[in-house]
Amino acid sequence: RDPHHTISTVAMTGGGSFPQPGEISLAHNGILYLDELPEYSRNVLEVLRQPLEDRKITVSRIRCNVEYPASFMLVASMNPCPCGYYTHPTKACVCSPGQVQKYLNRISGPLLDRIDLQIEVTPLPFEEMADSRPGESSATIRERVIRARQIQEARYADIPGIYCNCLLYTSPS
């Protein structure tokens, strides 16, 4: 799923007079990709928190409450600053420190806490992208993924409903 950054909170969560699932539920068992993360409204970003934690979302309306599954992988991308050149190896950033901070603050700490992996990707020069050396084939990568899933399946064979690490819970002490 790849919703536009102008999406409404209702379209993201689901709703309506007769509740329908939103993008969060439609991404169940898949990927929800948010490009230009800070461009989404604060409300839209904040409604992601609970489903990321609980893997379900409840849509409450006057007539009823509906619970939808919401076990998805959130993949998001963003620039390091409004102009996009902060930390760029060859281009100068034109943003003030205050502008950079304001831009980064559009994403709350609690939401960032739910994003398990954060990577800074530096731009590649065209020459490196155009390099004609063959990369790893999709078939080879596919086999590696299948093997990893088989290992996980064997690892959790005795635990019903668990097929990946994100479904594991620690017992309360």
Segments from the language model and where they lie:
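Conserved ASCE/P-loop NTPase catalytic core
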Residues: 1-105
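Conserved short S/T/G-enriched processing/targeting/catalytic segments and their helical context
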Residues: 32, 64, 70-168
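Conserved small/polar residues in nucleotide/adenosyl-binding loops
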Residues: 169-173
